Amino acid sequence: MSTLVSLPTAAPAPDYQSIDRPLHFSVAAAAKVRELIQEEGNADLALRVYIQGGGCSGFQYGFEFDENRAEDDLAVVTDGVTLLVDPLSLQYLMGAEVDYTESLTGAQFVIRNPNAKTTCGCGSSFSV
């Protein structure tokens, strides 16, 4: 005799486009990106943040300028400056903040990521 078991259906994947701010792009970071874009002389540039394998903790953050926005990219605009994130990277960055800090030890873009279980001392790699 066989018994049919009804399995629960998977919840639909969250639609990050409908979330108000899945990622925070600080005013300080936007100001620095604006300055760098002006130095490049190309007003069509946006800052792309992405995640890739590597680093001492398993994943690392990457930053690059990009003129092209893919249809499924998340675009966060702060003070007229655009930050782009692809959907695969966004799953690791949900709720994170992209900021820019200056201190006696130097200036850098910083990602404060609530999803990171551990980070390394350099601040550019993490694990989940």
UniProtKB/Swiss-Prot annotation:
Alphabetized Pfam families for the sequence: Fe-S_biosyn
PROSITE patterns reported for this sequence: HESB
CC cofactor: iron-sulfur cluster
The keyword Metal-binding is annotated on this UniProt entry: yes
Keywords, alphabetical: Iron, Iron-sulfur, Metal-binding
Keyword Cytoplasm: no
Annotated residues for binding of iron-sulfur cluster: C56, C120, C122
An annotated Gene Ontology molecular function: iron ion binding
InterPro entries membership: FeS_biogenesis, FeS_cluster_insertion, FeS_cluster_insertion_CS, FeS_cluster_insertion_RrpA, HesB-like_dom_sf
Gene Ontology CC annotation, any one: cytosol
Disulfide cysteine pairs (residue numbers): none
Cofactor remark from the record: Binds 1 iron-sulfur cluster per subunit.
GO BP terms: iron-sulfur cluster assembly
Gene3D superfamilies: HesB-like domain
Description of how the protein assembles with itself and partners: Homodimer.
Its job: Required for insertion of 4Fe-4S clusters for at least IspG.
Family statement: Belongs to the HesB/IscA family.
Name assigned to this protein: Iron-sulfur cluster insertion protein ErpA
Species assigned in the record: Xanthomonas oryzae pv. oryzae (strain KACC10331 / KXO85)
